[in-house]
A protein has these predicted regions:
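Glycine-rich beta-strand-to-loop/alpha-helix junction loops that act as flexible
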Residues: 81-86, 324-334
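A structural feature that tracks compact, well-ordered secondary-structure segments
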Residues: 219-221
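Small/polar loops that bind or transfer phosphate-bearing groups
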Residues: 14, 212, 233, 330-331
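Nucleotide/phosphate-binding catalytic cleft detector across ATP-hydrolyzing
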Residues: 1-19, 23-210, 227-229, 238, ...
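Catalytic-loop motifs flanking and including active-site residues across diverse enzymes
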Residues: 237, 241, 334, 369-375
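ATP-binding/phosphotransfer module of carbohydrate and carboxylate kinases, centering on a glycine-rich
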Residues: 308-326, 335-353, 383-385
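A cytosolic small-molecule/anion-sensing beta-strand core signal
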Residues: 224
Length: 409
């Protein structure tokens, strides 16, 4: 067994609709993450990102975790757990605080007070707060990203982005992990994790929309000026594209999935018009013909709808002008011409995302379908160093790590 310090190990666990992924990494003294273990298993008992059959889900999680343990030659005890599902919502909240000191100089205590005021929002019954992310401060109405401590003013304001979900849905995977003698060290919304994985500091500053096209859900997050300004979940993903094909082409779901992978496209190209493919059965005998143009049209309609919903949400929340770039990840990023369609609907340049500032096999860190799990490693590193800092009181380190996505909770 490799000799790693337990307090330097981070395990990410993503329980998706199509797959369960566990990745183990070591956080070294220079705060670099090195991947040392990987496990994956087909998902079972999960629909639209939420566990519906605990027995099946337990077995899928167990297989992925055991594979990661075997690869890393470690016995795992804690994980950073990714969560998604349509029960997850987000909102922005504001708080204000009058500066009481005679010299009107803003102190750390003023920061604590205004943050406390902004957090005084009411959650719906049964909801649990997942993240509270500081977006910006305001001093006498003037917006600023960095800490205003030391500045003078009469009124201090803050804007927070909060992500919340329902306790029962969040606790379901945690309970399964405990049956395996695993503890959830912390949980993170998958959409934020994916953004952590694939965005560079410059992209976060300039503004980017990250869309993770999963099997059962599509998670998204918008970063601008270095912070998350909006996020959300659509209960629509790649499986819905497959179901549309199964219905439209009159074939079983599994056959539709094969056709999507082999012949799919997000746009209807000229080359596809009138094209017909002969499809063989398991015995190698041709049993049907498929109109490729029709296949592409069915896929394009569903994918266009997904991007259009996100565009409408951005307009509704007045954040459309904050993104200068779209980064796609998740398994859906492999669909041919997906960038072309996304760019047309969202009217922005589009690229496929790959993890940044991680060390490990290229077969893992460069694959868009692992963005969430890789982002969970970064979230875990942020959380781990924050805990170390809390005991050692190293203020500069704390401030530096808070800038990761300015997650205050």
């Amino acid at each position: 067994m490799w000799m790693f310090k337990q307090d330097s190990l981070i395990t990410a666990l993503e329980i998706g609709t199509s797959k369960v992924v566990a990745i183990v990494a070591e956080l070294n003294e220079s705060e670099a993450l090195n991947i040392i273990g990987f496990g994956q298993a087909p998902s079972q008992g999960v629909i639209k990102g939420q566990i519906v059959d605990r027995k099946l889900a337990y077995e899928a999680i167990r297989k992925a975790v055991k594979a990661a343990e075997l690869k890393s030659d470690l016995e795992l005890h804690q994980v950073y757990l990714g969560v998604t599902g349509q029960h997850i919502t987000s909102s922005n909240y504001t708080g204000s605080h009058a500066i009481a000191s005679l010299d009107r100089c803003i102190t750390d205590e003023d920061i604590d007070d205004v943050m406390s005021n902004a957090r005084r929002f009411n959650l719906a019954q049964g909801q649990h707060m997942i993240h509270v992310i500081r977006q910006q401060f305001m001093v006498d109405g003037q917006r600023m990203i960095n800490s205003p401590v030391g500045l003078s003013g009469s009124d201090l304001g803050v804007v927070l982005h909060a992500v919340q979900g329902y306790k029962d849905d969040l606790h379901a995977p945690v309970q399964l992990l405990r049956r395996m003698k695993l503890e959830a060290e912390n949980i993170a919304f998958n959409g934020l994790a994916s953004a952590l994985a694939v965005l560079s500091p410059a992209q976060k500053a300039e503004g980017a929309l990250v869309i993770d096209l999963g099997g059962g859900t599509t998670d998204f997050a918008i970063c601008s000026r270095g912070v998350v300004c909006h996020s959300g979940v659509l209960a629509v993903g790649g499986d819905h594209v497959t179901q549309d094909l199964a219905t439209g082409l009159g074939c079983p779901f599994k056959r539709a999935e094969d056709l999507k992978i082999k012949f799919g496209s997000a746009i209807v190209s000229e080359a596809a018009r009138g094209q017909v493919r002969e499809i063989t059965n398991e015995s190698g005998i041709m049993d049907r013909r498929v109109n490729v143009e029709n296949l592409h049209r069915i896929m394009a309609e569903r994918l266009k709808e997904i991007f259009a919903i996100i565009a409408a949400e951005m307009d509704r929340c007045d954040v459309a002008d904050m993104a200068q770039l779209v980064v796609l990840c998740g398994g859906g990023a492999y669909i041919p011409e997906i960038c072309t369609l996304a760019g047309k609907v969202l009217e922005l340049p589009v690229q496929i995302g790959a993890a940044v500032n991680l060390h490990g096999p290229s077969t893992i860190i460069e694959r868009p379908e692992y963005a969430t799990a890789l982002g969970l490693l970064k979230f875990g590193a942020f959380d781990m160093v924050r805990q170390r800092e809390a005991s050692s009181k190293i203020i500069p380190l704390k401030q530096r790590l808070k800038n990761l996505l300015r997650i205050d909770h």
